[in-house]
Amino acid sequence: MFPLTEENKHVAQLLLNTGTCPRCIFRFCGVDFHAPYKLPYKELLNELQKFLETEKDELILEVMNPPPKKIRLQELEDSIDNLSQNGEGRISVSHVGSTASKNSNLNVCNVCLGILQEFCEKDFIKKVCQKVEASGFEFTSLVFSVSFPPQLSVREHAAWLLVKQEMGKQSLSLGRDDIVQLKEAYKWITHPLFSEELGVPIDGKSLFEVSVVFAHPETVEDCHFLAAICPDCFKPAKNKQSVFTRMAVMKALNKIKEEDFLKQFPCPPNSPKAVCAVLEIECAHGAVFVAGRYNKYSRNLPQTPWIIDGERKLESSVEELISDHLLAVFKAESFNFSSSGREDVDVRTLGNGRPFAIELVNPHRVHFTSQEIKELQQKINNSSNKIQVRDLQLVTREAIGHMKEGEEEKTKTYSALIWTNKAIQKKDIEFLNDIKDLKIDQKTPLRVLHRRPLAVRARVIHFMETQYVDEHHFRLHLKTQAGTYIKEFVHGDFGRTKPNIGSLMNVTADILELDVESVDVDWPPALDD
């Protein structure tokens, strides 16, 4: 059943004769169910022409001050003269515009610039799908997004003013919200075709996105007059190649007075010579996240690449030893590494290890069995004796928040080998065992002042346990609040950490070795070996 009614004929004939395609006509007539839009374009045009052939009265078009004045005004004057000689007093729509309705299938829509014509047909859908299949991405669903030229909003505004005026003659109204949005109509037509061609559902929450960007160089200046009338709407923004974004154009159209618009832009809009061009067809997959715990056994390995003034100081890092394997297997473009704290280059991380997470950006492969992840973990562990990884698993973006939760409240356990300048006996260190929840103030250490703001941070040493080695050495086991600088707690950092081991013992103390024994974060979940 054809979706238009007798009430729509006036508007449909008007739009068709001024160069508007059938699908845009449906939009302006408020057709909000999908089926009619999905008909093949030629069939749709034939059905529309059949529907309009039953119209008995010619429609009157009152052209609203179009800029290409000389051509169209001359056409109108000639039409009026011819009609007056025949004793008729009305202007036929068929005399206005460059195209009669029967030839509309040869012309580009003056509103959508071909978007709802050529780019809704199966040939174009197949072209996009071929690009998707050649991209090499794994996906079980997709979200399809399009970017239309901003001048489409200007053209739609002009067509709306035209239709609104004509409907006003019949005491009818047409609000902007009554028009079906171009993107909505485009989705109604294309989504089922994409889903059928690729064999997967269209899902707005899918991590795999196919995006198509359209442009129309021929009409790119359609928006420019708005900048002169509404300059506040068009301000340069970072990462934007043009000030004429869709949002800026819509803001200006909502602000501009109708009479000002009509002085500057043809109504109805001119028919273009060519359809839109496809600037790009891109595929991208949302990031996936891998988490685990790592042990670091080397005292000559930084957590992240150590590069100063463009020069690499050490050949590798914990981050690289793990991420290189993940990048290769997930076929990702890049990654972001994060962890629950960090250790210095000369500090080992023992026990159950330190929690970490890696964000893999735009991965092409995303589906793995638990066995495949276990094999990947083994591959990482076999590749180096400097680190080991455990509990490797895929996690969600939201789950990574657990790693950072309670950053100040969580605790860490350390083991340090201490040197003292004065000779000591076992009894000289035993009093440290009795100290509980010692509060200290730490001014930002000198060694990190270049990358951390100057501040005094209150920290807590929950307990200490000593182990005598010889008259100048003892081992100190301690549990502290996360974020405590252990080296500075031992040597005092020139008095910037108070109290410290040196001040408590009334000696000069320094730290020779430091190991992280545990990071007390219950994440990620432990896995069976």
UniProtKB/Swiss-Prot annotation:
GO MF: metal ion binding; primary miRNA binding; pseudouridine synthase activity; tRNA pseudouridine synthase activity; tRNA pseudouridine(55) synthase activity
SUPFAM superfamilies xrefs: Pseudouridine synthase
UniProt keyword terms in alphabetical order: Coiled coil, Cytoplasm, Isomerase, Metal-binding, Mitochondrion, Nucleus, Phosphoprotein, tRNA processing, Zinc
A single cellular component GO annotation: nucleus
Protein residues bound to Zn(2+): 21, 24, 109, 112
Annotated catalytic residues: 344
Start and end residues of each stretch annotated as RNA binding forefinger loop: 304-317
A Gene Ontology BP annotation from the UniProt entry: primary miRNA processing
PTM per Swiss-Prot/TrEMBL: Proteolytically cleaved during TRAIL-induced cell death. Cleaved, in vitro, either by caspase-3 (CASP3) or caspase-8 (CASP8).
Domain of life the protein comes from: Eukaryota
Function in brief: Protein with different functions depending on its subcellular location: involved in miRNA processing in the nucleus and acts as a tRNA pseudouridylate synthase in the cytoplasm. In the cytoplasm, acts as a pseudouridylate synthase by catalyzing synthesis of pseudouridine(54) and pseudouridine(55) from uracil-54 and uracil-55, respectively, in the psi GC loop of a subset of tRNAs. tRNA pseudouridylate synthase activity is enhanced by the presence of 1-methyladenosine at position 53-61 of tRNAs. Does not show tRNA pseudouridylate synthase activity in the nucleus.
Complex and partners: Interacts with components of the microprocessor complex DROSHA and DGCR8.
Name of the protein in question: tRNA pseudouridine synthase Pus10
